[in-house]
Amino acid sequence: MLRLLLLPLFLFTLSMCMGQTFQYSRGWTNGKRSFNAASPLLANGHLHRGSELGLTDLYDLQDWSSDRRLERCLSQLQRSLIARNCVPGSDFNANRVDPDPENSVHPRLSNINGENVLYSSANIPNRHRQSNELLEELSAAGGASAEPNVFGKH
């Protein structure tokens, strides 16, 4: 009696182990089996040929089209940026006369901030004067008391 019960149980266990080994030998994991549940139907029952034929990739068509759109958009953006930067009139320093062309290799690079209004060395006293004028206006208006030491440090 025990032999009749153990024999089917042993055969069932053996068949399950063989089936599991077959699935893992074909590269199936739990995530792949649950994600591609319809792939055996598309492969006409040939479970191992689905990945060889590329039929599992049919589910990624929407991803491919969106990837293509993103790549196309990126290439158009790159082309527009390159075209904008390569316009002949975009170099604002090209028409400027160099004061000492023989002393420096690239005079434009020696004074990068010379043409920038905020960071030019010529405007530093003006900025200090403007901050002092603001301090005087604040103290004359009787607003919030600002310490002169704070403005003097800048």
Curated annotation (Swiss-Prot):
The modification Pyrrolidone carboxylic acid is found at Q20. Residues 70-154 form a propeptide. Expression is restricted to 24 neurons in the larval CNS (8 in the brain and 16 in the ventral nerve cord) and 12-16 neurons in the pars lateralis of the adult brain. One of its GO terms (cellular component) is extracellular space. Residues 1-19 form the signal peptide. One of its GO terms (biological process) is courtship behavior. GO terms for molecular function: corazonin receptor binding; neuropeptide hormone activity. The modification Asparagine amide is found at N30. Coiled coil: none annotated. Keywords: Amidation, Cleavage on pair of basic residues, Neuropeptide, Pyrrolidone carboxylic acid, Secreted, Signal. Belongs to the corazonin family. Cardioactive peptide. Corazonin is probably involved in the physiological regulation of the heart beat. Clock (Clk) and cycle (cyc) proteins negatively regulate Crz transcription in a cell-specific manner. This is Pro-corazonin.
